[in-house]
């Protein structure tokens, strides 16, 4: 018989012992895991039982907080029972406030709308759990139909709540509730209701959400529902104005100008879109486009003083001086308190005089024409000074030059002192 070294027996025995230890450790860990799971489940049941008792005892807010603490643990979010207890807690708070209002007792109306908002959040969260496929990969919805039917009856409270907070100038909460109202249209929970095509209040809710975002200087909130808000034709001008202001604040020039153009196309005589789009074109030296804007606006309202003044500025820049003066006189005939009409007419004459004055040589006839231009400019510039006394930067130098050329010594001395003080 072959002799086997004792070392071999030792190694085999040692290996068996090691395997046994590993097996025991695995069994211990499995037992510990099962115990921990059991303990966790037991603790959950206890908390849910306590929450149900709290709801009955009139402590629904405490029950809600307890269930939300459980759901904060990702491992618990798939537990439908926690969601259901949470909903009962929120629902009870809504019913309590509603009862107080019905009985005309003193209560905080905001709590009613806040509870309604939370009810939607809870059942939408439950629906996401309900929609998960089972172990066979199939989705079996147990709650959707019932919960959607229940919430549909309360959905109007989200809109009303948004309006409530809007009137209270609580624009952040107003946005939150209007946003929840709108987003129901995208929630799988309400798929069968087809709010997108059937709910005629969605555009107005979108406008109010946009306005709320605008009032809180939140560009993301302002622009979130802008496309839907544009379907609210009664408030389209305001929608485009708030959107344009938001793009301008963000420095998005392309979107800003595009929105101005859209607004101007809808209403060429708008007191917002015409001036802003005109300023953009004119300040960049695009006089042709600026003039086109003026003519389009005047084609609808020939006596628009804003468009007439804007056009006179373009004509002055384009050196169409006779047309500029003619238009300024028409403006003054409509309203003799508009200072810029006098300024533009005065500069139209003044510029022509300076052009002759700056020439190396000029004939006697040219000099006479120059003085005539200065005299014509004078009456407009003096009136402009009276109407805009603080705009010394615009009237001081022209009047200084006019007084000098017309030998008006006393007036020249006064203007010289004013210029030196600037």
For each feature predicted by the language model, list its residue ranges:
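Structural register within alpha-helical repeat arrays
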Residues: 50, 86, 93, 154, ...
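Short coil/linker segments at helix-helix boundaries
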Residues: 89-168, 183-204, 350-380
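Conserved structural position within tetratricopeptide repeats
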Residues: 71-72, 183, 227-231, 262-265, ...
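Start-of-domain marker
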Residues: 44-109
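Residue at a conserved register position within TPR or TPR-like alpha-solenoid repeats
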Residues: 54, 90, 165, 213, ...
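Residue-level recognition of tetratricopeptide repeat
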Residues: 77-79, 188, 235-236, 270, ...
């Amino acid at each position: 018989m072959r002799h086997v070294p004792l070392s071999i027996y030792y190694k085999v025995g040692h290996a068996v012992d090691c395997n046994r230890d590993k097996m025991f450790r695995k069994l211990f860990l499995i037992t510990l895991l099962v115990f921990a799971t059991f303990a966790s489940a037991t603790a959950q049941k206890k908390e849910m039982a306590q929450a149900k008792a709290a709801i009955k005892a009139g402590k629904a807010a405490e029950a809600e907080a307890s269930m939300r603490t459980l759901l904060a643990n990702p491992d618990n979010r798939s537990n439908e029972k926690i969601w259901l207890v949470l909903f009962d807690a929120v629902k009870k708070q809504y019913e309590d406030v509603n009862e107080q209002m019905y009985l005309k007792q003193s209560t905080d109306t905001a709590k009613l709308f806040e509870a309604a908002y939370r009810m939607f959040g809870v059942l939408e969260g439950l629906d996401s759990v309900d929609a998960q496929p089972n172990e066979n990969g199939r989705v079996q919805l147990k709650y959707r139909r019932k919960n959607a039917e229940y919430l549909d009856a309360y959905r109007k409270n989200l809109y009303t709540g948004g309006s409530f907070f809007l009137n209270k100038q609580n624009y952040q909460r107003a946005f939150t509730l209007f946003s929840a109202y709108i987003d129901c249209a995208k929630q799988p929970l309400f798929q069968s209701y087809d709010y997108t095509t059937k709910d005629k209040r969605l555009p107005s809710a979108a406008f109010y959400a946009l306005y709320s975002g605008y009032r809180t200087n939140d560009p993301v909130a302002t622009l979130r529902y802008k496309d839907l808000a544009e379907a609210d034709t009664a408030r389209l001008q305001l929608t485009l104005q708030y959107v344009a202001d938001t793009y301008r604040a963000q420095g998005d020039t392309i979107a800003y100008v595009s929105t101005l153009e859209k607004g101007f196309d809808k209403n060429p005589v708008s007191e917002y879109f015409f001036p802003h789009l005109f300023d953009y074109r004119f300040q960049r030296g695009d006089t042709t486009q600026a003039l086109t804007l003026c003519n389009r606006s005047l084609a609808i309202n020939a006596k628009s003083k804003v468009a007439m003044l804007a056009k006179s500025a373009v004509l002055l820049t384009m050196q169409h001086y006779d047309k500029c003066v003619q238009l300024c006189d028409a403006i003054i005939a409509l309203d003799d308190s508009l200072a810029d009409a006098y300024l533009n007419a005065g500069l139209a004459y003044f510029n022509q005089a300076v052009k002759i004055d700056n020439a190396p040589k000029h004939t006697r006839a040219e000099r006479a024409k120059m003085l005539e231009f200065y005299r014509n400019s004078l009456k407009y510039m003096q009136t402009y000074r009276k109407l805009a006394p603080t705009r010394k930067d615009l009237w001081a130098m022209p009047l200084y030059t006019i007084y000098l050329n017309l030998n008006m010594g006393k007036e020249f001395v006064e203007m010289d002192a004013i210029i030196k003080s600037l």
